[in-house]
Amino acid sequence: MLISAPTSYGKTFIMREILYLNQEKYKNILLVFPTVALLRENALNMEELNQDKKMGYNVIKSIDREIDCQDRNIFVLTPERAMQLLAQYPNIEIDFFFYDEMYKIDEDYCNDETDDNDEKKNSYTERTFLDEARAKTFRICLYLLSKRVKDYYLAGPNLKREKFGKGMQRYIAENNIQVKEIEFEPTKRIMVKAYNKVIDEDYTNLPYLEKPGIVKIHSKVNDRICDVVNYIEQKGYGATILYCTTPAKANEYATKLAKNHQVNVVKNERFSEFIEHLKRNYNIDGSINEWSFVNVLEMGFGMHHGKMPKYIQKEILDLFNEGIFNLLFCTSTIVEGVNTNAKNMVVLNHSKGTKELTVFDFKNIIGRAGRYYHNFVGRYFLVDKELEKFEHTEDLTLNFVTYDDQELDPVDIDNSEYMDLSDINKNLKHKREEQFKEYLLTNDIYEKNRLIKREYQEMLLRFLLNNNILYNKFYRYLSYPDILMQFTTYHAMNTVLDIFEESGLLDSIIVRRYKAVSNTYCNEGFHGLLRYEIDNARGDKVKHKSIDKAYMDAFKTQKDIIEHKIPKILALFETIFSYASLLRRKTLDNFSLSKVSRFYETGVKSYIGEQLIEFGFPVDAIKRIEDNNLRLLSMDASASQKYILEHLEDIKQLLDSYERGLLDKALKSICS
């Protein structure tokens, strides 16, 4: 079943109803969400449903521990984690899956690579195996799940069957999928023109209501923003999100509005503690005084974008939804499925990063004004004249290229069954399979990292078989009992990166950068990355670099390199090194880099630390707990939870007041 319904209609509510009604039928359930923010929100909802209705499932959000596939499990994962589940447990029987925001299988819809990015990518990063378009992950994950699971529910907003491309039509037909198009809008949305000399609300379809009078506004964009905000407040229209194309624009608009528009800052203890926490944890030699994010918060506005640490993003959303502040500047990350209490959406720009918005992006953004069962009327203000064209632009064609006639990428071809391909792609697949007969790499090894081209995996395998020096250098690290320490203290990551450079998978510029970032992070944590960027800005090593840009670059480095690309390198390396060792007849005793990958992904070393990260707890606070309670590093789930509860008062002494309050909430969730 595929359900297309307006934004905030309640598509996940339908999913929960399906699960409740079929709890006797479904044992292993997989719920796939596009972002970690949505994953966390829905995992919490599933935990509450599971507990309230006594459904008897384990709710699992990551694949970092041994899983009993014979038990009753609800997996709440991103597409990347879902692929990891299929790779680690190839024989798992999934009885039902839900796939949210399924339109992201199409590159025209899924331009995630431009989200929150205000500068063009360096050309060399486009050439590595680490930079595949995210739509490919969505597409291959959905393709594989559709092949192995009978019952599933696909969801997306504003999808029209008449706009399905040939490939999408074939996918629907081949899999006997019922399509339900719901056009009923539970929330009435009023378009407001604010790009000329006046604010003009469109009441064309509301003849029974008195239209507000036209209000004059200024021509300069920052003055116009101030006029629109004043208008919303004077009319009592409620909470407002202001969409900006990049974090830099969000900083600029929010800072200038704060100077010209006074708001009554709500006195709230948690809000005050949160600001003090930020000042204490993100200050490098007074840099906090120049960081617009904190300055804007103190003036009573919120700011949200995808480069921020996850717990900060979550706190900002919670404070906004609780009414601590009524104005929230954001980029595209907040409007892609995350629910808020916003009644108004002010759209300030017609682009998304360096690319222009699509009509689909536009509909998704304005769909965040008002929410089903919360606000029955929402308003969207168009401050940029270029936005009006989206009111009259036709929807994009949604395609599933695997089933289409166009020539496919090698990764798509290798992950598709022969009979699903067009004639041209069947020929390409046949040629590739003939080529693979000369390969040492087997299918089962390839499929553990099936989003990485087979050619690259073969290159790495042959290098590890032929280069004794680097193979043996890494092999010696395995003679020590603590593999994580070999990476965090003795720079085993440098050896891995040398192997990727010498094998031709990464060039020297990237390797030098990744080594520096990894070594700094292992020695000094995020503060080391931030200090490097702050020093660059203050020393004028990078021309015209602001302190705001320094914070942004540090967050981006952590998210892009530390949390994403290094774990991807490690996953491939673990698989190929293990197979090369088998061919070399070298003994490996329980070799696994999963603990190392989790360290880079999360920044913590203990099981309880990983649970706290999943809840949304500050990494630096967890490190303080771990450093002062080293026994936690060797404890399993139940032992670490018991230890924390027994030593809770001592542990709280290591935390600030904001962190203490957050810890209490986290433990209620983790230990329930």
Where are these regions (language model features)?
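A short beta-strand element within the Helicase C-terminal
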Residues: 93-98, 327-351, 363, 378-383
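Conserved C-terminal RecA-like helicase domain
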Residues: 2, 6-9, 13-20, 24-74, ...
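Conserved segment of the helicase C-terminal RecA-like domain
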Residues: 146-152, 351-399
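Structural recognition of the conserved hydrophobic beta-strand(s) that form the central parallel beta-sheet
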Residues: 31-32, 75-78, 98, 150-157, ...
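C-terminal accessory/interaction regions of large nucleic acid-associated machines
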Residues: 423-672
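Conserved interdomain linker/interface between the two RecA-like ATPase lobes of SF2 helicase motors
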Residues: 66-67, 143, 149-257, 302
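SF2 helicase catalytic motif II
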Residues: 89-151
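Long, hydrophobic alpha-helical segments
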Residues: 389-441
